[in-house]
Amino acid sequence: HFIVIFRDVRGAIASMFSRADKNFKAPSTISFLRCWRKQVAFSAMMSESNLFNKRISFIKYENLVSDPEKEIAQLCSDLNIKYSSDMIDTKNFVGLGTNIKQWVPNSGYVDVPRTGIFNGSIERWRETLDETMISFIEFIAGPELKYLGYDLVNRDNYSKPKKRFYNIILEENNNSLGWRTDNNDAALDFSFEILRHFCLANNLDDLNIIKRFFLFPKIPFL
């Protein structure tokens, strides 16, 4: 059984920007967004495949931390196992793999309590990200955010390219020290995103172009 957890990518990026670890090398924002989009694309494909029928569960991070009992109880139902309140007691959490020590929070924010399920960061991106960055994120990942049911700040014009978006890509292209999946060419990457919106607006049916921009021959949010 596969369990996929989605998080509003605006919140994920805000958390990344807020990391107190000065040694952390953040990826370029466009690279982060493109990797997040791939997760959505693969999940959409899996949800429609008979191969994964009744073998995949989707959870929104925001719902999970807001009402963990409800979300985990539903997951237990999907897995046909009995729910226990111990499942959401963080004192019982351990690390991944060989790390069997007690789990500790790894949020980018410094005010996260050491125990309990913290939900204070869900909407914090609205305060910590400036208007330009929010618009840029929605320009790159707006269709996927809408597909997952997240409301957009710029719902009426999120697909409109702006020069300051290019400037973000260019600046990070020159200064980012973290991992990246871009083309190392700001103009090319910006053009790619403009063409992606053109494909959506015009319902192009060229399978090669669709796969180029959306990973699979079917666009899930059309």
Kindly give the residue locations of the regions a language model identified.
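PAPS-dependent sulfotransferase catalytic domain
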Residues: 1-89, 93-112
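PAPS-dependent sulfotransferases, especially Golgi type II membrane carbohydrate sulfotransferases
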Residues: 81-222
